[in-house]
Amino acid sequence: VPSTRALIHAPWSASKVSTALRCPRLFYFKYVEKIAEPEPMPEARIGKAIHVALEHALQGTPPTEAAAKARAVLTDEHEQARFDTLTVGVGPFTERINKFRRQRRVQRQVVEFALAVREDLTSTAFYAGDAYYRGIIDVAYLYDQQHLAIVDHKTGVRLPPVMMRDQLDGYLVLSAAWWRSARTFWLGIHWVASRAVEWSPPVTLAEISDRMAPNLLDNIEAAALAVDDGPRTNPGPWCDRCAYRKLCPASQERWEPVDYDDDED
């Protein structure tokens, strides 16, 4: 049974949990005070545009046309140049997906699919009042009636999958609740910059229910506890990339140099 403090801040998501654990002040800016990002990071704008291009391409829009539609929201020349470099791989990726669909008996494709579960991990609507944890899957394919392949697009620097374990496990917990016929799950990380898809070993339904689901609930409780004493700051290396840094009290702190006496070593 979730704690009251966890229920207060529901619905949770992977990014919401990680934000609470990293910096309670940022959590309050985003999820309690609901202040819009005053200074979105360039990589966030580029990543969002790339996701839009991939979404359109996977739904049948020609890759060049999909890229042009997504590029229209970017006004900075440097961001446009970075976007153009990344979208070179959109066409080859959709070709790989089409090849996969021809080789497998795909019953269903979903793109940018929003899922949610209740506190007992049964499925519910994304915006439902009883949603406890939720997420959006970039693309997934149900094939051969009992296999589900999930692909998550990443536009940043390629990282070891273990660094995204909580987010990826959350997708599996959500998917297991929504696709009841699935028995085996495959997770692929699409590294857009390197034009590669890195697949995890197959995950069984038993592994999701026995290990991943309890870990997810534990992480939510840890996040709720981290923000329970209010919006305290937690300065760290992430501050330089924070969109709220100009609003944060920690950015106003000044450290004075220490004066030593001449006769001290």
Regions flagged by a language model, labelled:
Residues 23, 50-51, 135-157, 170-171, ...:
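Conserved catalytic cores of phosphodiester-cleaving nucleases, focusing on short active-site segments
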Residues 14-62, 110-113, 244:
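Nuclease catalytic cores
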Residues 49-123:
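A non-catalytic, helix-rich entry segment at domain boundaries
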Residues 107-113, 131-137, 235:
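Short beta-strand or tight-loop elements
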Residues 11-12, 94, 118-123, 129, ...:
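Metal-dependent nuclease catalytic regions and adjoining charged, substrate-binding loops involved
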Residues 98-103, 129-132, 138-145:
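A short acidic-Thr-Gly-centered motif at the start of a beta-strand
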Residues 109, 148, 183-187:
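Residue-level recognition of the N-termini of beta-strands and the immediately preceding loop/turn
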Residues 41-45, 159-166:
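Short alpha-helix boundary/capping segments
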